[in-house]
């Protein structure tokens, strides 16, 4: 049951630190970056030319808009004069027709000229925008191609020690994500940046040259806008920090609970934990609502200020026009140029951000590229002897792994191997056997001493040459995802088919290969998954032999095989050894009997040498290992196939340093394990998203149904907000209309004052409606977020233990889901609804008004708008779809990179780094060519959308002039229609880009609904089932068959029958993994058996109420998990069905031998125990756990290795406490230390999920069976 501690401990710790560091990190996180110019260190002269020309084009493109405003201003003046003239005409009754038509012909001619100007600017923009985007994309694509190749080359060049300290998964991420970040940062985004800057400068230059007074007035308002934005940002960010902190607290609770889920389930703490979580969510909701209020006041205020600035600008502008200093066209030119210039600064920020990200990513990548390995497999230097005999010597070698420098593995190893000899290395796990093999290949260099071949220090020999004369077969051979023949070819580049066949015959693999349908061309699958262990191993041997190596290194080459395969492979190995210097490492000593020399390792040095018979006489390490293995074999003759497992268990028992050895083994196998985890991670992520039924928008909305009043108000405000844009268009055109009529200055003054005030009124309305819209949706969203998190967490706590065993449901994954899913759903519901309503209202009102004022022009515009909109959509799609397509295309090269990086040891042993590098470069060709092609396509679509606007202006105003000339519309109406439709369309475009990612939200909602609706097999919340009034405490297991749901192929219990009478103590013993802890978990009903029955007082426990059943069991496990609260609360956690009084807590503490210790603490029972009880020692934690189990006064006590983690002294104290606790209760004890269970009423010995022996301590000793040998092994190790 210490499973959970082990499984979730790591995840929890990581996330816990994340939470704490979050706020500190934000303050001081200044990631190292590379300098601006060194970002382009891989550009050649052509790339530089592309970038320079692209920048020039961007500057030209950026100047387009302000220049267009110049044209627009002059054009307005002409229209305004025409309006004045028309007004004048209509006042003169007696008018000559010639003047009239002549004048209007002039107007049309002028407009034709301006249409050409517009089109000219449009054409310039078309070309410039294309060059800007495609050239920057081309330059980026070419540089990224080089960076990818360089980076992969750099990785393939590093030595193994470097890989020990760098995470394999992280390197893959760098190859994909970080390189894409650089690509994002140095491509078209830089062009966009220069474009924005050009717009900014041109806008202000136009503004100051055409009318500096008005420019200064507009500029005077800008700081107010900027300042208010800064103040709001500050307030908001403090709220955000508070909100994050509250969520972090809630997250920490969730994490603590999920990491300790078995403890929570066993003690029925779900309700308590839910309340604790809910309390933190309440706090977060409160802050979130405050934040919504603040945020929306700030948005409203921003609109108020913007409209107010319009009012001021137009009021001052009309003053200037009336005094005759400016024309109305000048006012418009200045106003729009400055406005466009100011906005363009904001548009530059994504580019700046992308470039900053790229600099951060480049720092890590360039650091790896520039890292010079200490053992360079690409190096040409070093001696290449003509003739190698194969005499090996290790002279006084000391060594520790770079990832754990403090742990010394070899401590002065001396070993000589004559040419052609076979030397076997034996010893406990972790004594340094595999390390010698790795030093031989020069995967590492010794810290002291030297390794020599034929008397030459291997450090003077060329690295590649050295590795080419060595053949290696390891415990878990790595095959690559290609054909059998190709796999063998990895042994040596230019090997012929005959040589391959010869090697395969020597490796005893020829027959099984010829039986395969495609023979040598059979694909072996990823990591050789299509083949059995024995087949893989023989192909690996063939691969080693095809090199025709002088030296053969066999690192436990048969340990992973069953008896039959082992015999075949062993024969192959014996063949292969002939005439070669061979070093063999083996756990199964039967396989090394016939070695020339057997060397016994202990603690990093060789303590004995000789052949089998000599060493058996010496009665040293070798003798001990052999006797242990044979003892095991006698016991389980009928189970010979499981021999390796029990032998390893025996070894573990016998070796005191098995802990450190496990760590060492982990490090060797890490590259293999890591990669499998990686695969699993990928596939589970895919599985996660594939297995989820999609949900509709309404289904998501239903979750928020109770907040309908908020939605009504919000939608109403959104409609008003949508109508504000057309209202703006009307006022805007009316103000200009003032100057197209011949009124006396006083009337003009009054009218312009009126319209300026109306602008202000718009601002005030928008302040109110934007605030209300945001606040209502925000509040509803916060309520929803809280509700969803609560429901999801409640549902998680309801699931059974097998659900938590699923690798998809690790603590980390579940807490992330709790944090992200609800937030994403909230973003999509509220704001999405608001955005849709606002857009419909905006365009709808705009189009209706336009049709009223001028249907002909409206129709023309409505024909153009979709083209602009479609182009915009295409561009957005291209941008987002591009990223996906790029990812897909790079998957091929990613697979090669992943395979090479994850199996780097194998790649290095086979000296195939360059082959992989070549394959990687090949796989980049297609994506590279496509990226160049895409640069042009992207350039064309971008330039089209940019230029379309200019062309539509040309068409619109030329047609407008025609309508004005033929008196079908007034210029005022032309402007109104134009502003209403175009601004409407623009606003819709902008708002859509603000809409949060709806697709993500749908997936999140689907996750949420799936979890909420999932009913577990064993429902902890269930109220059904029997609840007997009394409980005796008789437990019976009848023919129980069971395996864990996550490992269905590994049987755990195979027909177990057991019986414990009330008040008896039953002890379970046996090797690791034989099913002892499983018995306890079945009794707690964490799982149900597949067959057979578990009975309590003769009633099947499936029929009892789950909560009731668990309430009568008290459990103490090997690593008890305490919660981050006081000692008293931790003890009281034992009974969550009621309020436990202080007296009971003290009584339980006394029974558990811990009361005196608690009283000695300054805060006594109120002392906080820290996260997972870290403030206490193991023995103290264990006794608090015992007190916790006793508080519920259980009828049955389950002790799962309750003292195994303690030192001798603590163990004695805890053992006394347990002996006290057992009195008068049925008790099931699991123990590795047999001394602790000698006085049990019944001892049961487990093997392979069945009972092998049972009786009292004395009876079992007399039988001289498994129990006897276990006791003697333990007594032996103690004596040592």
Curated annotation (Swiss-Prot):
Annotated positions binding ATP 2: 1070-1077
ABC transporter domain: residues covered: 392-628, 1035-1273
Gene3D superfamilies: ABC transporter type 1, transmembrane domain, P-loop containing nucleotide triphosphate hydrolases
GO terms for MF: ABC-type xenobiotic transporter activity; ATP binding; ATP hydrolysis activity; ATPase-coupled transmembrane transporter activity; carboxylic acid transmembrane transporter activity; ceramide floppase activity; efflux transmembrane transporter activity; floppase activity
Location of the protein in the cell: Cell membrane; Apical cell membrane; Cytoplasm
Segments on the Cytoplasmic face: 1-44, 138-186, 237-292, 353-711, 778-832, 875-934, 996-1280
Residues holding ATP 1: 427-434
Membrane disposition: Multi-pass membrane protein
Primary location recorded for the protein, binned into one broad class: membrane
A cellular component annotation (GO) from this entry: membrane
Transmembrane segments: 45-67, 117-137, 187-208, 216-236, 293-316, 331-352, 712-732, 757-777, 833-853, 855-874, 935-957, 974-995
Enzyme class label: translocase
Assembly and interaction partners: Interacts with PSMB5. Finds in a complex with ABCB1, TFPI2 and PPP2R3C; leading to the dephosphorylation of ABCB1.
Disease affiliated with this protein: Inflammatory bowel disease 13: A chronic, relapsing inflammation of the gastrointestinal tract with a complex etiology. It is subdivided into Crohn disease and ulcerative colitis phenotypes. Crohn disease may affect any part of the gastrointestinal tract from the mouth to the anus, but most frequently it involves the terminal ileum and colon. Bowel inflammation is transmural and discontinuous; it may contain granulomas or be associated with intestinal or perianal fistulas. Encephalopathy, acute transient: An autosomal recessive neurologic disorder triggered by specific drugs, or acute febrile or afebrile illness. Clinical features include encephalopathy, ataxia, spasticity, pyramidal signs, diplopia, vomiting, and coma. Symptoms fully resolve within few days.
Protein name: ATP-dependent translocase ABCB1
Organism annotation: Homo sapiens (Human)
Higher taxonomy: Eukaryota, Metazoa, Chordata, Craniata, Vertebrata
Gene name per UniProt: ABCB1
